[in-house]
């Protein structure tokens, strides 16, 4: 019994020691939690510093990659190292978050729970121990009393001995029960103490796992640093990659000269200089002024010479006295240095203009600046551009009327000393032969020039492939001058074209400024682009209304008269600025065409085509030996007046000029054959418009081959006289009243 009591005392002491240890561990846990919180704060700061460090590290790696001295291998290795460090930084961020979320916060909560659990365990143990001790003490007291009583009874009968033995056994059992109770209390205390550390390990595991992952990324740095050590082992020796930089530089056009922006246009140069002077240094070095077979020193329309040369003399580039273009806003064209119509980067023979009022007829007047301003007519050439060959006389009455309204002469060489016009250059057979390698009759050149010069029109939905049409600038005034725009003109609103330049019989016209003759025109090459879509040449002055219907001309107008409805603008006469909105979708003026009648059959009247039509020359080499020549001389779409072909009309019969009859008689023989072949070609005229006219089935695919054939023998036929008179008479334009100021409109 005493031994059991000692055992119970020992167990009770052990339990109490365990409980005391648990209670004394709380400050340690709390200190650990505090230090972990500080570590988390420092790790967050480290993460932010690592991010900034790695950003700077990446810049160094990029610099190493792009620098010529450091090879790409070094830059690539540094980039890989930076990537690994960024991965380490990511894992460090994860470790920091796990430290707070998985360890610090849960441990702080568990410390409070541990305190409560230890206190409760101590209370329970004390209660059980007191109860067991009380029972043992009571039973022991009863046993002592029974022993005393048994001693007295020993002298007597001895009846109390069994009771005493039973009481002693009960006391022993109580001590054993107390011992067992103490053991259970100690076990609970040990489990509680152990559970705390188990919980701590559970909280610590995610933190350590994140740290291991972070440290696992560090192992990849070993290979990267080994590569960098090898790449940078010999800093004083260039590797092959650096030697390749020197090899690559050899043969390349590497220059340190900085390109300056184009200079602003000056008063003595074209307005196009602001957009055309950038590559002009190369054009000036490529010989833009080489003489041409025609005999005139001209400027090529090719890509090498299509920009204004910087080396042009300042004395010959005086600004035109009138810079007003009737339809384009302004002229921006020098009299002697004129930009070719189309800046397409093609060869010299295929560089053509497709302006709405300009054609490819004159082969000798190649570099004439054709502006719509009164002082720069198409027949006025510069001093260094005098053409060779005969000249085509212009209508003198128009010249005289034009001189009355013109200001002083423009740049040097444009006008004579007396202010009179230089004679108009004729496209001579020699010049054509020089261009095409064959001989062409004067009649062919005259007829082709007139048809292409005066009646060449373009479709409304055409898209020009030249720069000046979309930029607001105009290389040469390629729109008809018969429209009064915001910029005033010193001429009438009408124009008429003729073959021989004879005077009109129905009132003297006041000017003739819309016959644009381009420079360097190889007519045969432009024939290939007949069916290509082209853009209108001007941004203003073109009709916006639909094409006239098949009802024909107004009843009050003669059959060969096209009415243009224009009224003077009420806007102030200010120069139009460059518009950034792009070209206005407008339609060029249309001239009516009548199907021709072959002169060999005088009684034949071809089908009349009222309204506006265009004819495209096509070649029938078996039936017309001159057709290839005619197609070369006039490859563009030609519009003919509806009275130019067929039976003579009263206007055509009574219209010959005073000085043109003799010349007409001389050229009738040669022209008749041309007219006959031309009639066959015009018979298949290409209808113009957006489905407003039926397309004739007689027009087959436009041939692309242009086989030169010798001109036919001259023949003479009287019916050709009236037709040529009608051709020479041209189209008569009349004034009508309208509120439309955008473009001439053919009714």
From Swiss-Prot:
The modification Phosphothreonine is found at residues 260, 643. Keywords: Actin-binding, Cell projection, Coiled coil, Cytoplasm, Disease variant, Intellectual disability, Phosphoprotein. The keyword Coiled coil applies. Residues 1-252 form the IMD domain. Changing residue 149 to D: Marked reduction in RAC1-binding, loss of increase in RAC1 activity and of dorsal ruffles formation in response to PDGF treatment. It is found in: Cytoplasm; Cell projection, Ruffle. One of its GO terms (cellular component) is cytoplasmic side of plasma membrane. Changing residue 116 to D: Marked reduction in RAC1-binding, loss of increase in RAC1 activity and of dorsal ruffles formation in response to PDGF treatment. It comes from the Eukaryota. Residues 719-736 form the WH2 domain. Residues 397-406 have a biased composition (Basic and acidic residues). Its main location: cytoplasm. Belongs to the MTSS family. Involved in plasma membrane dynamics. Potentiated PDGF-mediated formation of membrane ruffles and lamellipodia in fibroblasts, acting via RAC1 activation. May function in actin bundling. PANTHER family: ACTIN BUNDLING/MISSING IN METASTASIS-RELATED, PROTEIN MTSS 2. This is Protein MTSS 2. It comes from Homo sapiens (Human).
């Amino acid at each position: 019994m005493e031994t059991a009591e000692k055992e119970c005392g020992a167990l009770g002491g052990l339990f109490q020691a365990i409980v005391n240890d648990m209670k004394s561990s709380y400050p340690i846990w709390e200190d650990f939690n505090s230090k972990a919180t500080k570590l988390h704060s420092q790790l967050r700061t480290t993460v932010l510093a690592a991010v900034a460090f790695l950003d700077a590290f990446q810049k160094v790696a990029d610099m190493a990659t792009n620098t010529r001295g450091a090879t790409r291998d070094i830059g690539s290795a540094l980039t890989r190292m930076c990537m690994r460090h960024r991965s380490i930084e990511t894992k460090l961020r994860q470790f920091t978050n796990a430290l707070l979320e998985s360890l610090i916060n849960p441990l702080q909560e568990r410390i409070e729970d541990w305190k409560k659990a230890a206190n409760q365990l101590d209370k329970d143990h004390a209660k059980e121990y007191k109860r067991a001790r009380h029972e043992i003490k009571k039973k022991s007291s009863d046993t002592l009393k029974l022993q005393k009583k048994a001693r007295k009874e020993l002298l007597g009968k001895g009846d109390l001995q069994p009771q005493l033995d039973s009481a002693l056994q009960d006391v022993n059992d109580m001590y054993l029960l107390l011992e067992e109770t103490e053991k259970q209390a100690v076990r609970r205390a040990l489990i509680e103490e152990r559970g705390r550390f188990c919980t701590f390990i559970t909280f610590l595991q995610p933190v350590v796992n994140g740290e291991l992952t972070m440290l696992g990324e560090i192992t990849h740095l070993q290979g990267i640093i080994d590569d960098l050590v090898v790449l940078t082992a010999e800093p004083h020796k260039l590797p092959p990659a650096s030697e390749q930089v020197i090899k690559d530089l050899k043969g390349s056009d590497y220059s340190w000269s900085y390109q300056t922006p184009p200079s602003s246009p000056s008063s003595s140069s074209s307005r196009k200089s602001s957009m055309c002077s950038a590559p002009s240094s190369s054009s000036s070095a490529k010989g833009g002024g080489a003489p041409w077979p025609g005999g005139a020193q001209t400027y090529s329309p090719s890509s090498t010479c299509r920009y204004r040369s910087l080396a042009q003399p300042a004395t010959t580039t005086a600004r035109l006295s009138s810079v007003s273009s009737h339809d384009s806003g302004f002229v921006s064209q020098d009299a002697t240095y004129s930009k070719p119509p189309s800046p397409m980067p093609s060869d010299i023979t295929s560089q053509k203009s497709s302006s709405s009022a300009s054609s490819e007829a004159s082969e000798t007047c190649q570099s004439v600046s054709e502006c719509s301003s009164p002082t720069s007519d198409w027949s006025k050439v510069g001093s260094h551009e005098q053409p060779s060959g005969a000249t085509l006389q212009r209508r003198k009455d128009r010249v005289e009327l034009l001189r009355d309204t013109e200001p002083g002469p423009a740049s040097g060489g444009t006008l004579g000393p007396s202010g009179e016009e230089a004679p108009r250059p004729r496209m001579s057979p020699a010049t054509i032969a020089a261009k095409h390698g064959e001989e062409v009759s004067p009649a062919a050149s005259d007829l082709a020039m007139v048809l292409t010069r005066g009646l060449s029109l373009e479709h409304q939905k055409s898209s020009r492939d030249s720069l000046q049409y979309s930029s607001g600038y105009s290389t040469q005034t390629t729109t008809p001058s018969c429209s009064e725009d915001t910029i005033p003109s010193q001429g009438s609103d009408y124009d008429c074209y003729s073959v021989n330049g004879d005077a009109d019989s129905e009132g003297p016209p006041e000017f003739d400024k819309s016959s644009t003759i381009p420079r360097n025109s190889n007519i045969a090459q432009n024939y290939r682009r007949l069916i290509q879509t082209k853009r209108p040449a001007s941004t203003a002055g073109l009709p916006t209304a639909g094409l006239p219907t098949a009802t024909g001309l107004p009843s009050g107008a003669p059959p060969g008269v096209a009415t243009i409805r224009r009224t003077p603008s009420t806007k102030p006469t200010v120069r139009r600025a460059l518009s950034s909105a792009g070209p206005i979708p407008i339609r060029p003026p249309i001239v009516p065409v009548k199907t021709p009648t072959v002169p060999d059959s005088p009684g034949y009247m071809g089908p009349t085509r009222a309204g506006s039509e265009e004819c495209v020359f096509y070649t029938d080499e078996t039936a017309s030996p001159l057709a290839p020549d005619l197609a070369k001389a006039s490859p563009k779409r030609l519009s003919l007046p509806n009275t130019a072909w067929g039976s003579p009309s009263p206007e055509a019969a009574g219209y010959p000029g005073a000085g043109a009859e003799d010349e007409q008689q001389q050229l009738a023989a040669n022209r008749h054959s041309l007219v006959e072949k031309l009639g066959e070609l015009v018979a298949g005229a290409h209808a113009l418009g957006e489905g407003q006219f039926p397309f004739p089935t007689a027009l087959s695919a436009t041939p692309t081959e242009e086989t030169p054939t010798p001109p036919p023998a001259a023949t003479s036929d009287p019916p050709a006289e009236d037709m040529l008179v009608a051709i020479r008479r041209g189209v008569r334009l009349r004034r009508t009243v309208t509120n439309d100021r955008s473009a001439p409109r053919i009714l």
